[in-house]
Protein backbone atom coordinates (compact mmCIF):
# COMPACT_ATOMS: atom_id res chain seq x y z
CA UNK A 1 0.00 0.00 0.00
CA UNK A 2 1.43 3.35 -1.09
CA UNK A 3 0.88 7.00 -0.17
CA UNK A 4 -1.30 7.53 -3.24
CA UNK A 5 -3.71 4.87 -1.92
CA UNK A 6 -4.02 6.67 1.43
CA UNK A 7 -5.06 10.13 0.23
CA UNK A 8 -8.07 11.59 2.03
CA UNK A 9 -10.13 13.20 -0.76
CA UNK A 10 -12.10 15.66 1.38
CA UNK A 11 -9.11 17.63 2.81
CA UNK A 12 -8.61 20.72 0.62
CA UNK A 13 -5.26 22.51 0.58
CA UNK A 14 -5.02 26.16 1.56
CA UNK A 15 -3.78 28.84 -0.83
CA UNK A 16 -1.18 31.45 0.24
CA UNK A 17 -3.80 34.21 -0.10
CA UNK A 18 -6.35 32.48 2.20
CA UNK A 19 -6.86 34.13 5.55
CA UNK A 20 -6.10 32.62 8.94
CA UNK A 21 -9.79 32.42 9.85
CA UNK A 22 -10.46 30.11 6.88
CA UNK A 23 -7.50 27.92 7.86
CA UNK A 24 -8.70 27.60 11.46
CA UNK A 25 -12.27 26.89 10.32
CA UNK A 26 -11.07 24.10 8.01
CA UNK A 27 -8.84 22.64 10.71
CA UNK A 28 -11.80 22.51 13.07
CA UNK A 29 -14.10 21.07 10.40
CA UNK A 30 -11.67 18.32 9.36
CA UNK A 31 -10.28 17.76 12.88
CA UNK A 32 -6.63 18.26 11.92
CA UNK A 33 -3.82 20.40 13.34
CA UNK A 34 -1.95 20.95 10.06
CA UNK A 35 -2.90 21.89 6.52
CA UNK A 36 -0.79 22.09 3.37
CA UNK A 37 -0.49 25.37 1.48
CA UNK A 38 -0.50 24.93 -2.30
CA UNK A 39 0.06 27.47 -5.07
CA UNK A 40 -0.47 26.38 -8.69
CA UNK A 41 -0.27 22.66 -7.78
CA UNK A 42 3.03 23.15 -5.92
CA UNK A 43 3.41 22.61 -2.18
CA UNK A 44 4.71 25.93 -0.82
CA UNK A 45 4.15 25.53 2.91
CA UNK A 46 2.49 23.87 5.86
CA UNK A 47 0.51 25.64 8.58
CA UNK A 48 0.08 24.53 12.18
CA UNK A 49 -2.92 25.44 14.30
CA UNK A 50 -0.69 26.74 17.10
CA UNK A 51 1.03 29.20 14.75
CA UNK A 52 -2.33 30.37 13.43
CA UNK A 53 -3.77 30.90 16.91
CA UNK A 54 -0.77 33.00 17.93
CA UNK A 55 -1.50 35.47 15.14
CA UNK A 56 -3.60 38.39 16.43
CA UNK A 57 -5.16 39.27 13.06
CA UNK A 58 -7.68 36.66 11.86
CA UNK A 59 -7.67 38.29 8.41
CA UNK A 60 -3.90 37.99 7.96
CA UNK A 61 -2.78 35.78 5.11
CA UNK A 62 -1.76 32.17 5.63
CA UNK A 63 1.47 32.94 3.76
CA UNK A 64 2.63 35.10 6.68
CA UNK A 65 2.65 32.22 9.17
CA UNK A 66 3.26 29.06 7.11
CA UNK A 67 6.38 26.95 7.42
CA UNK A 68 8.42 27.21 4.24
CA UNK A 69 11.63 25.47 5.25
CA UNK A 70 11.86 21.66 5.21
CA UNK A 71 8.21 21.08 4.41
CA UNK A 72 7.46 17.42 5.22
CA UNK A 73 5.79 15.44 2.44
CA UNK A 74 5.47 11.92 1.07
CA UNK A 75 5.99 10.81 -2.51
CA UNK A 76 3.02 9.09 -4.18
CA UNK A 77 4.91 5.79 -4.39
CA UNK A 78 6.18 5.70 -0.79
CA UNK A 79 5.12 2.71 1.31
CA UNK A 80 2.60 3.15 4.12
CA UNK A 81 5.33 2.40 6.69
CA UNK A 82 7.35 5.40 5.47
CA UNK A 83 4.25 7.58 5.75
CA UNK A 84 3.58 6.36 9.30
CA UNK A 85 7.20 7.11 10.20
CA UNK A 86 6.73 10.66 8.91
CA UNK A 87 3.61 11.10 11.06
CA UNK A 88 5.48 9.80 14.09
CA UNK A 89 8.77 11.65 13.68
CA UNK A 90 7.28 15.02 12.74
CA UNK A 91 4.17 14.93 14.94
CA UNK A 92 1.88 15.68 11.99
CA UNK A 93 -1.87 15.25 11.64
CA UNK A 94 -1.71 15.65 7.84
CA UNK A 95 1.01 14.65 5.35
CA UNK A 96 0.97 16.25 1.88
CA UNK A 97 1.59 13.88 -1.05
CA UNK A 98 3.56 14.88 -4.17
CA UNK A 99 4.00 12.97 -7.40
CA UNK A 100 7.40 12.28 -8.99
CA UNK A 101 7.34 15.72 -10.66
CA UNK A 102 6.73 17.52 -7.35
CA UNK A 103 3.07 18.25 -8.11
CA UNK A 104 0.69 18.21 -5.14
CA UNK A 105 -1.78 15.31 -5.47
CA UNK A 106 -3.50 15.35 -2.07
CA UNK A 107 -3.09 14.86 1.65
CA UNK A 108 -3.21 11.94 4.04
CA UNK A 109 -4.74 12.33 7.48
CA UNK A 110 -3.28 10.45 10.40
CA UNK A 111 -6.67 8.83 10.98
CA UNK A 112 -6.92 7.58 7.37
CA UNK A 113 -3.37 6.20 7.48
CA UNK A 114 -4.09 4.36 10.72
CA UNK A 115 -7.28 2.83 9.27
CA UNK A 116 -5.40 1.62 6.19
CA UNK A 117 -2.56 0.25 8.35
CA UNK A 118 -5.10 -1.71 10.42
CA UNK A 119 -6.62 -3.00 7.18
CA UNK A 120 -3.18 -4.03 5.93
CA UNK A 121 -2.50 -5.91 9.16
CA UNK A 122 -5.93 -7.61 9.04
CA UNK A 123 -6.76 -6.30 12.50
CA UNK A 124 -10.47 -6.85 11.93
CA UNK A 125 -10.08 -10.51 10.99
CA UNK A 126 -10.66 -13.24 13.58
CA UNK A 127 -7.57 -15.08 14.71
CA UNK A 128 -4.84 -14.98 17.28
CA UNK A 129 -1.25 -14.02 17.74
CA UNK A 130 1.29 -16.53 18.96
CA UNK A 131 4.50 -15.29 20.52
CA UNK A 132 7.38 -17.73 20.64
CA UNK A 133 10.33 -16.80 22.82
CA UNK A 134 13.59 -18.57 22.11
CA UNK A 135 17.25 -17.97 22.69
CA UNK A 136 18.96 -16.63 19.59
CA UNK A 137 21.27 -19.63 19.52
CA UNK A 138 18.28 -22.00 19.58
CA UNK A 139 16.52 -20.36 16.63
CA UNK A 140 15.54 -22.82 13.94
CA UNK A 141 12.74 -22.35 11.44
CA UNK A 142 12.24 -26.11 11.41
CA UNK A 143 11.79 -26.16 15.20
CA UNK A 144 9.34 -23.26 15.12
CA UNK A 145 7.35 -24.99 12.37
CA UNK A 146 7.24 -28.23 14.37
CA UNK A 147 6.06 -26.39 17.51
CA UNK A 148 3.31 -24.57 15.62
CA UNK A 149 2.09 -27.64 13.74
CA UNK A 150 2.36 -29.93 16.76
CA UNK A 151 -0.04 -27.96 18.96
CA UNK A 152 -3.73 -27.89 18.07
Give names to the regions the model predicted:
Residues 3-4, 15-22, 31-34:
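Alpha-helical/coil-rich non-catalytic "connector" segments in signaling and regulatory proteins
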Residues 1-10, 46-92, 100, 104-149:
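Tandem CBS (Bateman) regulatory domains
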Residues 29-32, 90-92:
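Short, small/polar residue-rich loop motifs at catalytic or cofactor-binding pockets
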Residues 18-25, 79-84:
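Short, basic/aromatic recognition patches
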Residues 38, 98-99:
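Core beta-strand residues in small-molecule sensory/regulatory alpha/beta domains
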